[in-house]
């Protein structure tokens, strides 16, 4: 059985002085300064993280290039796989980000706007380098294609872009199957509804995606405890659990999380 991965993630933006800084928020809003990206990456590397995710959260929205200098500094300090997302729009952007030290790139907005980018990237650099990120939001209307029962109500999940700021009308389950067909090596599923709440992952969303594809799925948003990771692994079938707040603020350590999962029979990397 494949081991499950524990992945801390930092959301990076420019502070008032134009310096890269880590921010944490709720539902993609109310962002608060959390720390320095390079220092936090070093700490997670030493803490036993299986991988590390660096997301430039405003590059796509404002049309700015990804912070490649900061990516390089992070890559120099860690010895675990590094995924970088935000502002990646072209084949050259993928190439530049990988050259800066990333092992994988996470693409959201550009892939939805130009799906051929997935095919091109996978062909040029290998599917293992191409992670398709999906910022999903629940919609309780009649415009979707695949409906799920969530808390007694029928809803569908819409792909959003520009850091969750804009809807697309595209059904998440339709999109992930297309992304897989085009060569995506992993799917990074963010729930805007669960983001930062620490109330648990969006199990209906994650489970539906895992059922729809065979590509590895990284569950993101809402983790508040090791029990939430246990649930998303055992109930939804996720291959990896991403978390931010619970690790950033020291509520739980990666070591304690792995011990909790191991004691309950979840295969993890030691």
Curated annotation (Swiss-Prot):
Q: Which residues form the active site?
A: 11, 135
Output the superkingdom of the source species.
Archaea
Gene Ontology terms, cellular component aspect? cytoplasm
Q: Where in the cell is it found?
A: Cytoplasm
Does the record carry Lyase as a key word? yes
Give the main localization category: cytoplasm
Enumerate the GO terms in the molecular function aspect.
Answer: imidazoleglycerol-phosphate synthase activity; lyase activity
Gene3D superfamilies registered for this protein in UniProt: Aldolase class I (3.20.20.70)
Per UniProt, which keywords does this protein have?
Amino-acid biosynthesis, Cytoplasm, Histidine biosynthesis, Lyase
Which EC number(s) does UniProt give?
4.3.2.10
The keyword Cytoplasm is assigned to this record: yes
Q: Which residues form a coiled coil?
A: none
- Pathway the protein acts in: Amino-acid biosynthesis; L-histidine biosynthesis; L-histidine from 5-phospho-alpha-D-ribose 1-diphosphate: step 5/9
- What is catalyzed by this enzyme? 5-[(5-phospho-1-deoxy-D-ribulos-1-ylimino)methylamino]-1-(5-phospho-beta-D-ribosyl)imidazole-4-carboxamide + L-glutamine = D-erythro-1-(imidazol-4-yl)glycerol 3-phosphate + 5-amino-1-(5-phospho-beta-D-ribosyl)imidazole-4-carboxamide + L-glutamate + H(+)
BP term (GO), one: L-histidine biosynthetic process
- Assembly and interaction partners: Heterodimer of HisH and HisF.
Into which family does the record put it?
Belongs to the HisA/HisF family.
PANTHER family under this entry? Answer: IMIDAZOLE GLYCEROL PHOSPHATE SYNTHASE HISHF, IMIDAZOLE GLYCEROL PHOSPHATE SYNTHASE SUBUNIT HISF/H IGP SYNTHASE SUBUNIT HISF/H
What's this protein's function? Answer: IGPS catalyzes the conversion of PRFAR and glutamine to IGP, AICAR and glutamate. The HisF subunit catalyzes the cyclization activity that produces IGP and AICAR from PRFAR using the ammonia provided by the HisH subunit.
According to UniProt, the name of this protein is Imidazole glycerol phosphate synthase subunit HisF
């Amino acid at each position: 059985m494949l081991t499950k991965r524990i992945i801390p993630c930092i959301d990076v933006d420019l502070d008032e002085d134009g310096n890269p800084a880590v921010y944490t928020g709720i539902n993609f809003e109310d962002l608060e300064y959390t720390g320095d990206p390079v220092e936090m990456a070093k700490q997670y590397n030493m803490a036993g993280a299986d991988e590390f995710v660096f997301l430039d959260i405003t590059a796509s929205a404002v049309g700015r290039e990804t912070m490649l200098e900061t990516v390089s500094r992070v890559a120099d300090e860690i010895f675990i796989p590094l995924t970088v997302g935000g502002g990646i729009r072209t084949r050259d952007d993928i190439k530049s980000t990988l050259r800066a030290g990333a092992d994988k790139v996470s693409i959201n907005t550009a892939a939805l706007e130009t799906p051929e980018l997935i095919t091109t990237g996978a062909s040029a650099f290998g599917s293992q380098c191409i992670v398709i990120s999906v910022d999903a939001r629940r919609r309780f209307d009649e415009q979707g294609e695949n409906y799920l029962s969530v808390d007694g109500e029928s809803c569908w999940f819409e792909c959003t872009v520009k850091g969750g700021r804009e809807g697309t009308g595209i059904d998440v389950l339709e999109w992930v199957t297309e992304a897989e067909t085009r060569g995506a090596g992993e799917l990074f599923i963010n729930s805007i509804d669960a983001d930062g709440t620490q109330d648990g992952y969006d199990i209906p969303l994650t489970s539906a995606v895992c059922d729809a594809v065979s590509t590895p799925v990284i569950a993101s948003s809402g983790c508040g405890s090791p029990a939430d990771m246990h649930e998303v692994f055992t109930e939804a079938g996720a291959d990896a659990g991403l978390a931010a707040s619970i690790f950033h603020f020291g509520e739980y350590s990666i070591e304690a999380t792995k011990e909790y999962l191991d004691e309950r029979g979840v295969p993890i990397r030691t």
